[in-house]
Every structure is written in C-alpha cells, then in structure tokens.
C-alpha cells in the first residue's frame, strides 16, 4: 500500500508495432485521463477522455500498490521491436520514478490487483 501522496502519478498503456495502435491511462489524485490512437490512421486520437477521480477510487488504487514490490520489478520487454505489443506501467512521485514494460496481457502476481484496476479503467474509457 502506498501512503496517500498527492504527487503520485500512475501511467499505463500499451503500444503495438506497425502503427497498429497505442493507448495511455494517466491517473493522479484528482483526474483520470485516457488517450487511444492508431498512428497509422491519423494524428488525431480516436479516444481522448478525462474525468475526475473519486476519493474511493484513488484509495482503492493506492491500496492496490505494493510500492516495494513494484520497485523491485525489472521487466523490460520489447515485443514492439518485432511488431508485437507491449504493455507498460510507470509510477512516479516526488521521490521515485519506476517503469516496467512487459508482453501485452501478461499478469504479474505481485502487481495483479493494480493491473486489474487499470484494465477496468481502460475498459470503461474505451466503451
């Protein structure tokens, strides 16, 4: 669990080779923003949405993060290098910044609760 930290920002997304598409989800203590684009089709995102985050949602996200576990993960795949897809998660605040990149759809046991929340948010914004 992360202690309530208003400077914390969680970013996640996916990117696929051959201009197939990419998205990003940016979560802070006040806002959730989602952008999805298919670079091969247009420079204009197909989806660009944002909404305020509730205190309950923010607390659920904070409770889903074991920061020590996340900081110890060392995933750095490059499926996009061979026209595949990679998923990424970055966590940053005033004191730390760490990012991992892994094969799209892979569940990592130590961060599965966070991955589940990010997946739910992504589904919400894509519909």
List each language-model region with its residue ranges:
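Short glycine/serine/proline-enriched coil/turn segments at secondary-structure junctions
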Residues: 16-19, 41
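Acidic/histidine-rich, surface-exposed loop or edge segments in extracytoplasmic proteins
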Residues: 34-48, 98-100
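Residues that flank catalytic or metal-binding motifs in active/ligand-binding sites
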Residues: 21-23, 47-49, 85
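Short, solvent-exposed loop/hinge segments that bridge or flank secondary-structure elements
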Residues: 18-28
């Amino acid at each position: 669990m992360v202690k309530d930290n208003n400077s914390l920002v969680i970013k996640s997304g996916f990117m696929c080779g051959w201009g197939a598409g990419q998205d990003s989800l940016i979560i802070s203590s006040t806002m959730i923003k989602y952008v999805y684009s298919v670079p091969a089709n247009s420079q204009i995102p197909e989806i660009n949405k944002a909404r305020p985050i509730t205190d309950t949602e923010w607390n659920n996200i904070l409770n889903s993060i074991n920061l020590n576990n996340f900081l110890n993960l060392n995933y750095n795949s490059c499926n996009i290098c061979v026209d595949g897809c990679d998923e990424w998660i970055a966590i940053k605040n005033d004191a730390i910044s760490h990012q991992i990149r892994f094969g799209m759809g892979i569940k990592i046991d130590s961060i599965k609760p966070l991955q589940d929340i990010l997946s739910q948010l992504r589904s919400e914004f894509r519909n």
